[in-house]
Amino acid sequence: MPRSLKKGPFVDEHLLNKVDAQNEAGTKQVIKTWSRRSTILPDFIGHTFAVHDGRKHVPVFVEDSMVGHKLGEFAPTKTFKGHVKDDKKGRR
């Protein structure tokens, strides 16, 4: 079920403060965050976030099409190595 419109999008306060500070200063440094649950706002466009995936920080550059999604959607937590080929000749 989606979040109520009356509540508005959820963004961690510390993350919003970091983005506002960079917007005022006019800088575009990488913002390291563990907040995968924060919604991407239009103020975030053009910034790069280092989103934690449980092991390392994945760089995510925010574009127009990402607004309204969560930061965690762009930093996958599981690495898919591929399926092993069923090679019965090699087992003998």
From Swiss-Prot:
InterPro entries in the record: Ribosomal_uS19, Ribosomal_uS19_bac-type, Ribosomal_uS19_CS, Ribosomal_uS19_SF
Organism: Corynebacterium aurimucosum (strain ATCC 700975 / DSM 44827 / CIP 107346 / CN-1) (Corynebacterium nigricans)
Domain of life: Bacteria
Gene Ontology biological-process entries: ribosomal small subunit assembly; translation
Lineage: Bacteria, Bacillati, Actinomycetota, Actinomycetes, Mycobacteriales
Cited Pfam families: Ribosomal_S19 (PF00203)
Protein name: Small ribosomal subunit protein uS19
Key words, A-Z: Ribonucleoprotein, Ribosomal protein, RNA-binding, rRNA-binding
GO cellular component: cytoplasm; small ribosomal subunit
Biological role stated in the UniProt entry: Protein S19 forms a complex with S13 that binds strongly to the 16S ribosomal RNA.
